[in-house]
From Swiss-Prot:
GO terms for cellular component: membrane. Its main location: membrane. The chain crosses the membrane at residues 13-35. This is Uncharacterized protein 056R. Residues 71-98, 234-252 have a biased composition (Low complexity). It is a single-pass membrane protein. Residues 70-146, 234-269 are annotated as: Disordered. It comes from Invertebrate iridescent virus 6.
């Protein structure tokens, strides 16, 4: 069986039996596991570094948003402050509010809120959104960390918009002669070591007939049995005995004439050599 795989989507992996390979642009998914190419290493490192920075900022925010700090913030206006007089000036109100509100940490900007609040709260700019009353608003969409739920979010890479998705392994069909085709990708029976790929396959049948080109996209184990799906090695030997006067051209199948007295002396290794020679001449 001759394999003709698209060079743009050809990858070499240690593939086991019943494994499905999906080529998604520059991402290869084998058995539901994503393998990234070299061109995406820098982008992944950048995203990881930004996520680590966001985690560090959120950790620092949570340290200042502990329940103990909230109790101090809620108890400070009632114990230390008094209701302002109607005749108080704006400067006195501002000085009183600055005395009640805690000082912001250095990583949050280090300035007090400009507008009055019903009770002291916390403001932050780490996610690009101001928050009051200790509640965080939703961050910008570009700052949302990548998870399994929002993994379909499109992004730009290599000047192309791609969508990533988690793929499940495609189980092969249990029947011997039929194939399981889904979305233009076909797989063979389970007992063979099969790999599905996006390419074309030329299927050669050895005997006193011409090779046939398969229109389906599939690949099987490179052994003698998938090359002769409906006949065994013995039946091929019998067909060679019955057609001892016929010769095969080197471009079609096996070159040379076989005599009936030498057929029983062909070993399995010799048959494999003849098959390999026919495949090389076909290329």
């Amino acid at each position: 069986m001759e394999q003709k795989i698209d060079k743009k989507n050809s990858y070499s992996f240690g593939i086991t039996s019943s494994t499905t390979v999906h080529v998604l642009g520059e991402v290869v998914a084998i058995g539901g596991i994503l393998y990234y190419t070299h061109s995406q290493v820098n982008q992944l490192n950048t995203k990881i570094a930004s996520l680590e920075k966001q985690i560090l900022d959120l950790t620092n925010i949570l340290k200042h948003l502990s329940p103990h700090s909230f109790q101090q913030l809620q108890s400070s206006p009632t114990t230390q402050s008094t209701p302002p007089l109607p005749q108080s000036t704006p400067q006195s109100q501002q000085s009183q509010q600055s005395a009640v509100l805690p000082q912001r940490p250095s990583f949050l900007g280090g300035s007090t809120p400009k507008e009055s609040q019903s009770f002291p709260g916390v403001e932050t700019r780490s996610l690009g959104e101001k928050t009051t009353r200790g509640k965080l608003k939703s961050p910008h969409p570009s700052q949302i960390p990548v998870t399994q739920e929002n993994f379909h979010y499109p992004y730009q890479t290599m000047n192309k918009t791609m969508r990533w998705e988690f793929l499940k392994p495609v189980e092969s069909d249990e029947s011997e002669d039929e194939t399981n085709c889904q979305n233009g990708v076909c797989t063979l029976q389970k007992q063979e070591k099969n790999v599905t790929f996006n390419g074309s396959v030329e299927q050669l049948k050895y005997g006193n007939f011409s090779p046939q080109r398969s229109t389906k996209t599939m690949i099987g184990s490179p052994s003698i049995r998938p090359l002769i799906p409906h006949e065994s090695i013995e039946s091929v030997s019998e067909s060679i005995e019955s057609s001892q006067d016929q010769s095969f051209s080197s471009r079609e199948t096996i070159s040379g004439n076989f005599k009936s007295k030498d057929d029983h002396q062909l070993s399995e290794s010799e048959i494999n050599q003849l098959v390999s020679k026919a495949i090389r001449t076909k290329k």
